[in-house]
Amino acid sequence: MLTKFHSYETGKAFTECCDCGCNLHDVDIYIINQSFAGNECIFECAMCLQCRERMNEQLSENSRVAMFDFMHDHADMKSRQERLSNNSETEAYIESCITCDKLRSEAKTFTLGAMFSGDQLIKGPFPLIICDDCEAKIAASISDETRKFWDDYIAEHFPGPPSEIDLPNKTKPILI
C-alpha cells in the first residue's frame, strides 16, 4: 500500500540516507521518492534533507529554474491546501498528480514523494505524486548537464535497473 512509504525492496521502513548513509531518525527531515510503473515500484530512495539540498546545488541553474517554474505554473498549492488539511487521509494527497490532477490509476508511471521527520509523515505540499505526462514535461525542460548528473548519480548509487534500462517514458525517475 502506497501510504506506508516503506521500502518495496525490504518491506521495512527506510533507515539510511541513500547518499551519505546517515540514520534517517538522527536527522530532522528526510524525503522518500518512489517511482512506479503501474503498481510495481521500479525505483526508490530515501535521502536526508542536507543531501537533497546538496544535490539540488549540483543541478544547473537553468534546470532549477525550469523545475521551479513548472511546479509554480502547474501546481495550485492554495487550492490543494484548501481541499486537504493536515488531518486528511494520506491517500487523498496521492490520488492524483499535483500538477495536472491526472488520477494515479490512469498514469502509466508516476513518482511519489513524501517528507518525514522521524517516523512522522509531514503533510503540506507532501506527500504528492507526479504523473508520467508531467514527468516527461519536467524531463524535457532540464539541461543536458543536469540530465547527465542525474543519470550518473543513479548509475553510481543504484547499479542495475533503473540505471541500465529505458523506462516506459524513456527517462530516468525524477527526484522530487
Segments (PLM) and residue ranges:
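Short, intrinsically disordered terminal segments enriched in charged and Pro/Gly residues
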Residues: 1-9, 57-91, 140-176
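N-terminal alpha-helical interaction blocks
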Residues: 2-5, 27, 45-47
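Short recognition patches in nucleic-acid-associated and regulatory proteins
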Residues: 11-42, 62, 92-124
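Short amphipathic alpha-helical patches
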Residues: 28-31, 41-44, 71-75, 120-124, ...
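Short metal-binding segments enriched for Cys and/or His
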Residues: 42-68, 123-150
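Cys/His-clustered metal-coordination modules, chiefly Zn-binding fingers
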Residues: 83-90, 96, 102-124, 130-133, ...
